[in-house]
């Protein structure tokens, strides 16, 4: 597929002088992603053009190689003959002598035929795998793209990743933007009038990566959405540029090599490659040019859409097809343009820094999705920087003749149903059931710098066998009952990535390299020891996965589920993980170990998945599917959505995943100080309905803890968290904020109670405990029982006996103290007419806190932690549903309330941390609110209306200065869901997943609310009490009733009569209840 001639075949050539203007505007793009536009005479020859641009590109004319549509421009021909006017030509520098091979890791990198990529049939020669000159090196793209052989041959690819330090996220952003702009230009080239051959070239250029015209055919865009989608074509082409595909490029100086090569690793760069503001300005200029070119088509796009509803195309098929083409291409251009704006919008330049200044990002890529995960089709692999990686491509048996496209990204292989059959290279991955679609090919990657070795397998079906996936998968699963298959999310547009991590058995701990004959099978039952190194391996992976939405797939015996597409990505920041798509890796002749638990119980927890790493050989344990004894290496299987949440949204994913029997684990907590407290006491995350399951028995708590610590070190490393330490939340926050006492425990009233409670929680729980709580483990709360019980007895009841009346009186006193904070929290949002939001929240909090306090004071058995977690989760979701109902279903209003409280609470915390927290909370909260397990009808009983008599206080309120109950529930709510990316999982479970308990956040809210109003710092101190009093006075003004006298007096008699008729009908209807039909009650029954 790589043969260059293919796609661009008709390109240059031939054409007799095509009619071009006297001057041509030609854009030249070098491999350092700089694009320069030159206006030259149409009669200028290629050689003259090289001399013309030599000074600008800093490459002597004799070393320049201009490539257009996959062909090298010949010096003696005129530019006009190539029809390059308004197009982009790629410029590379002639390859250096072969003696200058890379200095590390690449055995075959510099020598012989550049990187021997597993090539499809020696499809056309390729240029050198790694040009040494940094101009030809894309230091920002860590990707190997290669063809898989269909004839069973195996080739090793060694990639030198030493340029890791050179990677710069601002540079990545600019490169992404330039790639997307280039894709837009390619789309525009298809929209603009041009010779007929151009269209064909555009179709073929998907394989000829350098070609300008073919990037975004329907395939790539459809494959992925979001920010990575635009990169699909770009990544594909990025390496290609360097490898100068197409025939002509073979002349590049090194011997031909089959298939495309991975992005070359620059040798020359030694310092961080941060872009300068001028480069940003150039990209913006290019963006402006693209927008201006797009403008006329955008106008036509609007015109087509404006008339689309009624236009008759019955007798105008050609017109319909043309209009449809415009809609599709302009729509795709808008998507790319939007992603370009997203990529560029976070770039900033600090003018106060010393010159020379460079760009930095204010919001890391992980804010949107996993950084640099290439998610387009065949085998985009992001390899960990700083490690030497050996990749072996092996075909199973000679199957269908077609091979994966050269670009490795232009095709979208369907998930392969089973693990590969023994490949000719002698590295069988396990028995494969009969397949109708032909044996899958297998990619194996081993990180040689990690102990234990992590094997990475990818099943890749032949391009020709891209059947529905579901049918082949079902046959696979039925054929192999003992092999658990990742549970496919039904209805999800593209199957999520399936990651299988295997810990090889001891005899295979260090295979010479995956391509050669593997060591003798040896013992197939893994040694349970070395949990530390295994935990380190898994924690790195999980740390990355927690940065993005994740669905943990459970293998269900007998369930036919398509495997996920073969896309694998390893976080660039994680040094000891390998992720894969496909069956469980393992030694030769080992049956693929079943993925996590197969039983469709709703009590599956994250720990059980990790437990499968340790207990695959235990009959009926979590490591076996259907109770079959497994002798394979332990594995953990995780399915990841392939679409970044920041653009695509997780709606489809969540809706689809709700059909999966086992609920995925709850979200992990964001490493923010404010968040941590929220997740603290009752504030624990969603827990699976059942706590037990096979996981806990197979997984020692120490192992889970070590994994979590590794995850935290990956998540919080940038915040200076000490990995593996039992640092308490309080210590972590204090170290982060520089404050010695952030909770103000000495205050009076409710503020004092909650400040003290929060201090107790944060001093006794670590971030590891919080993560465990968020994953449904109640052990930390169970461990905290004595402290909580003593604290409530002392500070809540004042030493009195914990009788029912005493608890109710204490709760009343406590929650009443929060009235001012609740009112203040909702002061800036629009509440439903007639609803008393303050009393609604106070009564709700009082009832919830009554239950929590009674449980803390009365429960003495082992169910303490589990029940407390359930109470907190239930309270959180009911609070969210209640306030969402009171705000008229306006999610933005609820988000504003929560973020406002967070900002007030975080007065002394690093602003960037607060910004990150509010943004993350908002994203997670939106997901949670869209899939609330609690409906409005379940919380209507808590709604209080203006004018209703208040509830009588319990007999004589306690004089003990109780504390207050949490202010607006919303905050804590936001806290729990916001944590971590697995929030979607929590939601998709449907059971009662809800992070953290109400009390913690609320208290904080109240505390901070009083002290740090946003406006308080902007006015003289003596004005603050006066302004506060005015605010309170204004809030007491009664809202106008729903139907005013003015409205009624102006109402036509007929309508007035209709209203009275409806009132009579409602009064006579035995099924009518104001509680069930509040809108009808308000509209027709309430007297104005």
Curated annotation (Swiss-Prot):
Biased composition (Basic and acidic residues): 228-246, 1059-1068
Signal sequence coordinates: none
Region (Disordered): 1-23, 94-136, 193-276, 390-440, 459-491, 503-528, 557-603, 655-700, 945-1088
Ranges where the record places region Sufficient for the delivery of client proteins to the endoplasmic reticulum: 1027-1088
Top-rank lineage group of the source organism: Eukaryota
Residue ranges with Low complexity bias: 101-121, 193-207, 398-429, 463-479, 560-583, 1007-1025
Protein name: Large proline-rich protein BAG6
Provenance organism: Ornithorhynchus anatinus (Duckbill platypus)
